[in-house]
């Protein structure tokens, strides 16, 4: 009996020791953020080491990301209101990701309000992204010159700005109205086109409409439609009313689901998505499209009107579209979050619908462990080879090297001497207690 009791005690001791070790491994604060569904598969979760949060682990902190769309992410951060992430979410909003830049009005209001105690807001580019144009049950690909965009398909259907403006405004509603830029003639396919658009506040929408606002005219756009750079797709339509062939979907996942359903039904459809929701040619490591039986969405190549070249929506072509951009070089310029977002609405070269997705942070955090973990995570995101591999595997590119250097010198350290770095003691003091 005594021997049995000793064995039970030994087992209990091992269990307690194991629990203690697990707790130690998961030491540190919970850091939560959310927003852009575009970057959600890249950020991921602690349970998936093929994502940034999973690769980071839980030794210093546990990061949690809610995929709710860029608009909701912005609102969550600007108000420090976690219910924008979900009805039952509580605690502090430590960061947000948004493909759309914050407006001047949003930045001004934050500075005058929550920023007085939380500290200055930081907005920096997180990744470079193309916005793809998936096409299901579209015209047969007959080209021998357009680039590959889809697994098992050497070439792609091609679209130009007139096609994009016509389709996304409702002027062109059948493939036999859409002109093939290679031949100058309409596609032969007689099939009505469904257009899938984001119903939520979407940075993916903002990147698309930024381009459409730059290139669409009264000649190639449906009467009454004027594209505006907005997170809300319907903002470009009179009274917010879209044509009957348009179908709303919430989140990038919702758009993909609609396309998959229409593909199975034999219905032709066009949409806009980040590469990680499309196929494994563009995003070979995406957790969305690597699952067994996952649909590989066909994607169009686009003509760049400035140089006449056809581009696939690869991360390299998105970086080409960004061009030679320079980050802010003085303290006055660098202290304005609006100056950190490059504009590639109508690029001279590269894939025409490209841009950056941003991460939004606070300069001051009340918990020193949160501050340290946020800095550590961002350092790894921008410089660690494993993190870079995850970014590329989801179809995105890292920000230009001059931006990486400036971000490191200005925000992740104080090498620049601008006192903009996270947790700077001369800023995060007194009534500025941090969030």
PLM region descriptions:
Residues 1-26:
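Gram-negative bacterial Sec-dependent N-terminal signal peptides
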């Amino acid at each position: 009996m005594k021997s049995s009791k000793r064995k039970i005690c030994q087992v209990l001791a091992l269990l307690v020791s194991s629990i203690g070790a697990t707790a130690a491994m998961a030491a540190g604060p919970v850091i939560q953020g959310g927003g852009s569904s575009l970057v959600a598969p890249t950020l991921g979760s602690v349970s998936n080491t093929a994502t940034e949060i999973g690769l980071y682990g839980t030794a210093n902190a546990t990061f949690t990301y809610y995929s709710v769309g860029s608009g909701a992410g912005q609102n969550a951060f600007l108000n420090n209101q976690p219910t924008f992430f979900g009805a039952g979410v509580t605690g502090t909003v430590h960061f947000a990701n948004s493909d759309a830049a914050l407006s001047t009005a949003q930045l001004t209001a934050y500075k005058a309000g929550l920023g007085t105690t939380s500290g200055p807001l930081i907005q920096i580019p997180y990744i470079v992204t193309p916005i793809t144009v998936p096409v299901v049950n579209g015209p047969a690909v007959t080209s021998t010159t357009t680039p590959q965009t889809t697994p098992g398909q050497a070439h792609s259907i091609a679209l130009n700005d007139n096609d994009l403006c016509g389709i996304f405004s409702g002027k062109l509603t059948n493939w036999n109205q859409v002109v093939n830029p290679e031949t100058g003639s309409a596609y032969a396919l007689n099939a009505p086109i469904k257009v899938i658009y984001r119903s939520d506040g979407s940075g993916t929408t903002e990147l698309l409409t930024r381009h459409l606002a730059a290139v669409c005219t009264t000649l190639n756009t449906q009467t009454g439609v004027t594209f505006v750079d907005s997170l809300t797709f319907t903002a470009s339509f009179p009274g917010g009313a879209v044509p009957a062939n348009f179908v709303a979907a919430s989140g990038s996942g919702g758009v993909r689901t609609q396309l998959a359903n229409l593909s199975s039904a034999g219905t032709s459809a066009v949409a806009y998505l980040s590469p990680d929701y499309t196929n494994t040619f563009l995003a070979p490591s995406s957790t969305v499209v690597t699952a067994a039986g996952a649909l590989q969405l066909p994607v169009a190549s686009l003509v760049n009107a400035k140089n006449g070249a056809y581009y696939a929506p690869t991360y390299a072509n998105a970086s080409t579209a960004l061009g030679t951009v320079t980050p802010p070089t003085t303290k006055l310029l660098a202290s304005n979050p609006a100056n950190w977002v490059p504009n590639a609405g109508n690029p001279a070269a590269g894939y025409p619908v490209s841009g950056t997705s941003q991460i939004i942070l606070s300069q001051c955090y009340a918990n020193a462990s949160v501050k340290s973990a946020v800095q550590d995570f961002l350092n790894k995101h921008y410089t660690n080879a494993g993190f870079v591999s995850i970014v590329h595997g989801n179809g995105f590119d890292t920000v230009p090297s001059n931006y990486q250097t400036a971000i490191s010198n200005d925000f992740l350290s104080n090498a620049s001497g601008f006192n903009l770095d996270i947790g700077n003691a001369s800023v995060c003091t007194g009534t500025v207690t941090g969030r």
